[in-house]
Amino acid sequence: MAEISRQAYADMFGPTTGDKVRLADTDLWIEVENDLTIYGEEVKFGGGKVIRDGMGQGQMTAQDCVDLVLTNALIVDHWGIVKADIGVKDGRIFAVGKAGNPDIQPGVTIPIGAATEVIAAEGKIVTAGGIDTHIHWICPQQAEEALVSGVTTMIGGGTGPAAGTNATTCTPGPWYIARMLQAADTLPVNIGLLGKGNGSNPDALREQIAAGAIGLKIHEDWGSTPATINCSLSVAEEMDIQVALHSDTLNEAGFVEDTLAAIDGRTIHTFHTEGAGGGHAPDIITACAHPNILPSSTNPTLPYTVNTIDEHLDMLMVCHHLDPDIAEDVAFAESRIRRETIAAEDVLHDIGAFSLTSSDSQAMGRVGEVIIRTWQVAHRMKVQRGALAEESGDNDNFRAKRYVAKYTINPALTHGIAHEVGSVEAGKLADLVVWSPAFFGVKPATIVKGGMIACAPMGDINASIPTPQPVHYRPMFGSLGAARHATRLTFISQAADANRIPQQLNLQSAIAVVKGCRTVKKADMIHNGLQPNITVDAQTYEVRIDGELITSEPADVLPMAQRYFLF
């Protein structure tokens, strides 16, 4: 076989096994673990290239070929960092493997025919669409902002810019749940709604799940008492949905130990588990040690920087309807903001003790920065802590898998949607984000939603080619008209499906049902299942694991930041 240099090969077909790629302007380097495209048989589209009739394109009809192939992609997912072609059919991932013409090429698992479109992913990174599980539905425009950042699934609650929604992620009651499901039918992302879990009458909670909510949110602003926690979890066990918890900062109804006793070993998703976003002061962070607790962070405290503390007080006062002229309100806000626990949070992510990242959109968090901030934490931890013990070789592959899992597969597992989304695997909805390595985690090159391009940077519409400035993100055909309904999912509960809620509401989008929410445990959080022996000093707020102080230094400079947003 004729040979070319490794550099020439990478320029033509993208990096291959053993090549390394830098992620944006971070200190993170990934190494290609395997290449499934078969040397000498690679497919590529273009003038004089391979995907032509009788060459890389076969003679089969649409029934026997894929609708879309992403060629020579470098996949970064929880299961590996692999070069492969990705085939998509009927809006779902058909296979990850070798694309081409099976009549003349060996090892083809993704047949290309006249019905096949091509996205050229040579030299590009492909990840699964992000999943944000902490959405305050304050305004519908959040969906567009999230989508252009690489997030394709949004889970949360709310009804618009009402005081309740500004503070809590709850869509309260069957009437609002119905209206929000109808409104979400027009959004270009997958959605799932959380009902209000603050209630001691189980029927008031059951009716919300039966109306279409995929989970319940318990929030201290509505009263996170042991009674409401127990009631919500009892209904959850009965109806197979998840419960999300923002616990009692003021410790009015009990301490963290009382909340854990009310949870009683049942699975629960704890929001902003560090505590600045809310939760038992100062030691809600210790909840991450328990096998039934699925701990997440919201992004205002990620990563820890020299500005983190200063910006939090004003954010908190606005979001939780507090009055700066009332001393008790100020004291409440200040009790949630602790340098010591914030400094420990990044480390807890790096060792896999915190399992998920999310936004807290417009309610202290930034909906378009889940992915950016997750990778900024990964960078900061490499700079401060060096290579992880789990790494093999001179690369950051394990760290990359750990961090990508925090906003893809682990939120999917937590909320019972991993059978539909959350990874680049056959059978799942083709929600795929294509990145140029230099812009990884910051600005996607293409966002594929349900097998069709939904959003992409696009140049002057009157130009002779697609690239002249001004270039900015624009909605594409996959997010327009009835195509939007065909390429997105609305998640509902099993009870709502049995009640034919989508038919009653005349929803046009594809429907998916959540399942397995009650059996998932911390150990199931991929690369993020550590259950440390963690303590917090009640006076100094210092965090320790097995007696060792856990802390980090605040950053004064970050990658993936201003240099990317000058244009």
UniProtKB/Swiss-Prot annotation:
It is found in: Cytoplasm. The modification N6-carboxylysine is found at residue 217. GO terms for cellular component: cytoplasm. GO terms for biological process: urea catabolic process. Its cofactor is Ni cation. Residues 129-567 form the Urease domain. It catalyses: urea + 2 H2O + H(+) = hydrogencarbonate + 2 NH4(+). Substrate binds at residue 219. Its main location: cytoplasm. The active site is at 320 (proton donor). InterPro entries: Amidohydro-rel, Metal-dep_hydrolase_composite, Metal_Hydrolase, Urease_alpha_N_dom, Urease_alpha_subunit, Urease_AS, Urease_asu, Urease_asu_c. Disulfide bonds: none annotated. Keywords: Cytoplasm, Hydrolase, Metal-binding, Nickel. Carboxylation allows a single lysine to coordinate two nickel ions. Gene3D superfamilies: Metal-dependent hydrolases, Urease, subunit C, domain 1. Pathway: Nitrogen metabolism; urea degradation; CO(2) and NH(3) from urea (urease route): step 1/1. One of its GO terms (molecular function) is urease activity. Its EC number is 3.5.1.5. Ni(2+) 2 binds at residues 217, 246, 272. Binds 2 nickel ions per subunit. Belongs to the metallo-dependent hydrolases superfamily. Urease alpha subunit family. Heterotrimer of UreA (gamma), UreB (beta) and UreC (alpha) subunits. Three heterotrimers associate to form the active enzyme. This is Urease subunit alpha. The gene is ureC.
